[in-house]
């Protein structure tokens, strides 16, 4: 939510007019105008580029992309921006956080570099609405390995402990899952987006600095089920609320079984109304037209009566957005940050 009074719209509404407020939008508007002027005396290709640039400016809302393993969520956003600007024939900006960017995109809910799946993206004024996606439900498929612990709680880290697991049965795992369901307390991993003195704990850990464990905090798990157990590997289907760490869950399950465990594979299959199978655009469909269609499709997921009330005062850090059938609480948490580039 912006600090100033503004019209609050659904995060999934596609604007028909460009957002020309602010230096960043003005810079893009100038680039589009220049492209259009050149097109008036140029080739059909130039006309097409000018039309694409104008269409890119008009995009505003929230959609989903498929994040593969490897890049960070921020790196993926940079790649998305570069592809869209290149398609429209507009200059690609220097990735300097101190500079105003011509095209605003953001994501609502980080995925680790080793993870894959649904990444919710806001474009244009849609970036202002990403906070509401953070506290919503998410669903994951996670594969863990018993008998091994790492410093990062996943396969990218160094092995710190090994314990026997040969006596653990499928019934043992299924029997403890109820302990991790509902409103529970969870200690977040040290390798995380949580911050100390303005720096991420993961950054401090990589530099070899000593970092104290954070206290347990309340989180919500809607459901957990064991999909497969082939020792030492087990696969879980987890639906949870915001601020929940699958890596911590798998580690805690290992400890509860008098062993240890770490995450091998992690896929986010759903965030809010967006599913990996139906809504997440793969990279070969990161085009202006495909994203425009995706924005319209995402809008259709919401009931027509879904509207957000206009706030007449500056929002607090814990503001409720009320709509016809649900209330989304915008609670700012250190790890649940909206990344905007």
UniProtKB/Swiss-Prot annotation:
GO cellular component, one term: nucleus
Species of origin: Rattus norvegicus (Rat)
Active-site residues, as the UniProt record annotates them: 112 (nucleophile)
Alphabetical UniProt keywords: Acetylation, Cytoplasm, Isomerase, mRNA processing, Nucleus, tRNA processing
Domain of life: Eukaryota
Family membership noted in the UniProt record: Belongs to the pseudouridine synthase TruB family.
Location of the protein in the cell: Nucleus; Cytoplasm, Cytosol
One GO term (biological process): mRNA processing
The protein's name: Pseudouridylate synthase TRUB1
UniProt feature coiled coil, ranges: none
